[in-house]
């Protein structure tokens, strides 16, 4: 799993962890999301899901990840432009 921890300014609204799902299958995404939830300790996760512009059959991961998070009652929103825009999600766990 590709991920990065941000140890920057404690007052900045930065995610606890950033995960890049480029190149993942939907199954691998689901496993990674489930593992993060099980692992616990994360309240704010940035998921880089891409926009699917280069996918032969159109975007797959963006719709899948959004649908899966919704089915698990996990709150999320699109990242700000400077944080990835429509190719990235800000995910908030309790």
Predicted feature residues:
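Long, charged, low-complexity intrinsically disordered regions
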Residues: 1-94
């Amino acid at each position: 799993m590709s991920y990065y921890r941000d140890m920057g300014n404690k007052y900045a609204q930065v995610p606890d962890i950033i995960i890049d799902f480029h190149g993942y299958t939907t199954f691998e995404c689901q496993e990674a999301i489930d593992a993060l939830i099980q692992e616990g300790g994360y309240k704010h996760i940035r998921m880089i899901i891409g926009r699917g512009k280069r996918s032969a059959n159109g975007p797959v991961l963006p719709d899948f990840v959004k649908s899966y998070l919704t089915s698990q009652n996990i709150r999320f929103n699109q990242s700000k432009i400077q944080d990835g825009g429509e190719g990235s999600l800000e995910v908030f766990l309790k």
